C-alpha cells in the first residue's frame, strides 16, 4: 500500500477509536460523500476534528465573541501531519482531541456564566 492509502487507513482507525471512546459523551460522526471523503467528529453540530484528503487530521479552533467583540471562549487548534508510526500519530491526535473536547465544555460553561445578551458570534480560525 502507498503511504497515501496507509494514511487514509490510519484516519479511519483514529476516527473509529475516538468515536468508540466518545460517542457516549455526545460525539457523532459526519461524513462527506465519495471515496476518501472528509470525516468529521462533532458535538452539537460543532466540528472538533476533521480528516483531510491528503492524510492530515485537524483538531479545530473556534472562538466565540459577544456583541462587544470580546472573545469569551475558544477551543484548541492543532494540525497533524500523518506519521508512518501509527501509535505516535494516533497518540498525538487523541491528546489534542481530548483537549478540544474538554475546552469545548469549558467554553460552553463560560458562555452560560456570562449570560451574554445579544447574539454570540462564532468565528472559525484558519490554520496559519
List where the protein language model places each region.
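Contiguous, amphipathic alpha-helical segments that mediate oligomerization or scaffolding
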Residues: 1-7, 96-111
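Negatively charged, low-complexity tracts enriched in Asp/Glu with abundant Ser/Thr
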Residues: 1-38
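Generic detector of well-ordered alpha-helical segments enriched in charged/polar residues
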Residues: 12-19, 98, 102-105, 117, ...
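Intrinsically disordered, low-complexity regulatory segments enriched in Ser/Thr/Pro
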Residues: 36-103
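Short acidic, low-complexity intrinsically disordered linear motifs used
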Residues: 110-128
Amino acid at each position: 500500500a502507498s503511504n497515501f492509502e496507509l494514511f487514509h487507513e490510519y484516519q479511519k482507525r483514529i476516527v473509529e477509536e475516538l468515536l468508540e471512546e466518545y460517542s457516549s459523551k455526545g460525539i457523532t460522526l459526519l461524513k462527506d460523500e465519495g471515496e476518501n471523503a472528509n470525516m468529521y467528529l462533532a458535538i452539537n453540530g460543532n466540528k472538533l476534528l476533521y480528516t483531510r484528503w491528503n492524510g492530515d487530521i485537524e483538531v479545530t479552533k473556534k472562538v466565540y465573541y459577544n456583541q462587544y467583540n470580546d472573545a469569551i471562549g475558544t477551543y484548541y487548534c492543532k494540525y497533524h501531519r500523518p506519521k508512518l508510526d501509527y501509535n505516535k500519530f494516533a497518540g498525538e491526535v487523541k491528546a489534542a482531541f481530548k483537549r478540544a473536547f474538554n475546552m469545548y465544555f469549558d467554553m460552553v460553561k463560560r458562555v452560560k456564566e456570562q449570560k451574554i445578551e445579544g447574539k454570540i458570534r462564532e468565528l472559525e480560525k484558519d490554520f496559519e
